Amino acid sequence: MAILVTGGAGYIGSHTCIELLNADYEVVIVDNFSNSNPIALQRVQQITGKTIKVYEIDLLNELELERVFQENSIEAVIHFAGLKAVGESVVNPLLYFEKNLISTISLCTVMQKYNVKNIVFSSSATVYGLPETLPITEDFPLEVRNPYGRTKRMIEEMLHDVYISDSSWSISILRYFNPIGAHESGLIGEDSIGIPNNLMPYITKVAIGELKELNVFGNTYETSDGTGVRDYIHVCDLANGHVAALKKTIEMNEVGIFNLGTGRGYSVLEVLRAFESATSLTVPYKVCDPRPGDVAIYYADATRAFKELGWKAKKSLEEMCKDAWRWQLNNPNGYLKRKKQSTSSK
Ligand code: NAD
Ligand code: UD1
């Protein structure tokens, strides 16, 4: 029996494939490489010494997708594929409803047809909106503020309805906080295209000299040093969270929602200082206006994942910084030969 990983060539997907292979799962990948490169998958195989089966298919193509279910004994699906750029989703919401929501409908329809009813879904902490208290538990009220977040919430709700209609489904919804870092080999990592929107890839691009300085978005928030606080989680810890969730999804028939975070927050300046100390580099920065729509503080209560999945994040901020830097240094142009131009970068 194999695990189908949609979007398996992407940032989180490729790291998760390593942990799945290390745990002796057979892995089949469906990816259209719209925001990734097949080289990532060669490197996953190089790191693990194991082989994976790869289909270059767009999830919206149901007929092609059926072929994957016909040719393999799929036991469960980990569903990463989708677009993730918040700003792009505001400009082009229909693209996001098509590529995230419709493609998930297509996936679940095919799963149902082939009687594969175990799914682990990549959601996001973005579904919580503005938290009134901290840390954020899974039963906090949801409030989405952009089309990207709305697609995540709608998919979560859709999966609930699917379960209500047929309780032989088993569904794990994973709400990620802020994944950063890279595999310690330095062979795979986050292949940001253009100017990154997110903090860690921006820092590494300043450190390598590709960008001049970090723009710190605001220093008057009600936080220890006035800069925004987030729950950064090492991508390999996150990947392991998927293996833990997968086991539970296969064993049980229920809908589970889990925060995947470390449970502690770091400010922008704390991350910057940690990066400098982990790499012995100096990263220039300047303070700018706050980014519209940003929340001051955001961090997870990850107790449920520990109690019910037996999972918790282990890696330190220092390891996240060191690994992010190793990836950047060894791969200044990411995966180099990009196969197709991306439609999405966060
Ligand atoms: P990514 O862009 O690196 O990976 C997504 C993968 O899906 C890519 O390989 C892309 O080519 C593929 N893909 C996209 N649309 C497809 C389609 N229609 N058919 C087939 N393949 C398709 O993104 P990531 O950072 O690895 O994120 C994975 C998932 O986790 C996404 O659903 C994202 O919304 C979610 N998420 C990510 C973050 C984050 O900070 N990276 C945070 C919260 C949630
Ligand atoms: C982003 C996503 C969100 C996703 C989350 C987790 C956006 C708008 N939001 O939010 O949907 O769920 O990641 O992966 O992309 N910062 C700077 N300078 C920079 C970049 C960031 O100061 O150049 C600050 C931000 O103001 C914030 C912190 O760094 O305080 C983290 O920012 P970022 O990495 O973009 O993550 P989120 O804001 O949490």
Name these PLM-found stretches.
Residues I57, N61, I195-P196, R264, ...:
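Residue-level signature of the cytosolic catalytic core of signaling kinases
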Residues F97, R145-R153, G189, I193-N197, ...:
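Short-chain dehydrogenase/reductase
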Residues Y202-K346:
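C-terminal substrate-binding subdomain of Rossmann-fold SDR/epimerase-dehydratase oxidoreductases
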Residues M1-A182:
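N-terminal Rossmann-like NAD(P)+-binding domain of SDR-like oxidoreductases, especially those catalyzing
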Residues P38, N178-N198, G209-R230:
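Short, flexible, glycine-rich and Lys/Arg-enriched loop motifs at helix boundaries
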